Amino acid sequence: MSFRKVHIAIILLAAVVFLLILHHNILGLTDILTRQSSDSAPLVFQRLEALRDAHESPPEERQGEEIAVVIPGVEERLGGLVAAINSISSNTKSNVVFYIITTNDTKGHIRSWLDGTGLKRVTYKLLAFDTRVLDGKVRVDAGAEPVKPMTFARFYLPNLLPETKKAIYLDDDVIVQDDIRDLYNTPLRPGHAAAFSDDCDSVTSKFPVRGAANQYNYIGFLDYKKERIRSLGMRANTCSFNPGVFVANLTEWRRQNVTRQLEKWMELDVAEELYSKTLSASITAPPLLIVFYQRHSNLDPLWHVRHLGSSSGKRYSPQFVKAAKLLHWNGHFKPWGRTSSYPEVWEKWFIPDPMGQFAPIRRHGEADGTK
């Protein structure tokens, strides 16, 4: 009888131990499931975002503050984008992240070019620009060149980079010959959302653009015969600036709602034709000139040596071009075109397209695919 009691007690004890272990495991599993259910959504979202938009960091990952460099990626000009990125990344050891604004049908070409060449070392993110935001905001004159929507992407930097506080914007027809960190560190005065290089600076004003009157003043971009322009009280002889290179304080940009201010003047131009037709066909500079009138800081002139694309001749001396920190081929004569100024400087940084869709055009019609 006593033996049966002992046997029953042992069985009951074993059952209790089993139930305790089972209870513990169930609690642990419940905790794991609870944590997974609360964390899985953002983790999946972040992973998809990384795969969709970001190139993985290179093995020799660069440390320090992120320097955001924004460049448009237009299909027919991708050679310019690649050369610009190569020149920047080769001249700095800083943690540069390239934000390439493009369209969905160009993303694959960009990835192929950057990931399949020596540029696989760079870190970049592809940002899709929704051109529908421009509906009703861009006037198209009869006989004018087709509007290129990507040129307005610079107006929407805070929307495209919502978490970024400061960024550099560059057109795709530039070459950087110094450490981009120096440009990024350009001091911006309190209340200023951007820094530009004035057209009346000591560098560019010495080399006038042939045949262009009022080439460096507001009157060359805005129609001062219109009452709405005159009522702003802006002096017609105020120095203009080129918006192809600038440093932006995006925190201040958001605070002042600069994007909406720019859109306002775009819409008013559609209704009232406020831009001047005497100098150039620029439709991006006028709203920027209005919004940033006497409210922008200045870049070092050597960080925006421009007008190399205004003619096929050599505007500057070889010594000066070598000393420049950033060269800009704004104008019709691009460095990848048939004729241009100092194409050899640009070609130094060009990397041939692995897909064979882009090649510089040179004299006699041959394509030059050399680096």
From Swiss-Prot:
Transmembrane segments: 8-28
Keyword annotations: Glycoprotein, Glycosyltransferase, Membrane, Signal-anchor, Transferase, Transmembrane, Transmembrane helix
Membrane-related topology note: Single-pass type II membrane protein
GO cellular component, one term: membrane
Cellular compartments annotated: Membrane
Top-level class of the enzyme under EC nomenclature: transferase
Lumenal topological domain: 29-371
Descriptive protein name: Glycosyltransferase 8 domain-containing protein 1
Organism: Xenopus tropicalis (Western clawed frog)
Gene: glt8d1
